[in-house]
Amino acid sequence: EKHAADVLQPDIANAGGITELKKIAAIAESKHITMAPHNVCSPVGAMAEIQLDESLINFEIQEYHAEFYTGHYFTVLDGFTRQKDGYVDLSDAPGLGLELNEREIAKHPPLKKITSSGGTVRGI
């Protein structure tokens, strides 16, 4: 009501997912506030936001940390989009456009537990 913000930067994971972020965007749009979603530094969250961004009238820019998304993201997830020259392409695959590469994931077994019951890191 007081127009204290010109741009909102909600995080899809903390906002409650795609539907909740869409609701936030609709309220922002009614107040002439643009959206610049915060990237959760997760490829799944990034793809969800990128897909949602395309549907937002008040979308301004998407935070995308290309330096975090290195080779392993592109080997364990088929369909994860790469940023090129400041842009990303939308996938036309179903859902978020991602598919787990189970063969690649199997090459990397889970790490053993490295914390004690009190949370102290041990054995590394």
Where are these regions (language model features)?
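Shared catalytic-loop signature of beta/alpha-barrel
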Residues: 1-87, 91-94
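Extended hydrophobic packing segments that form well-structured cores
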Residues: 96-124
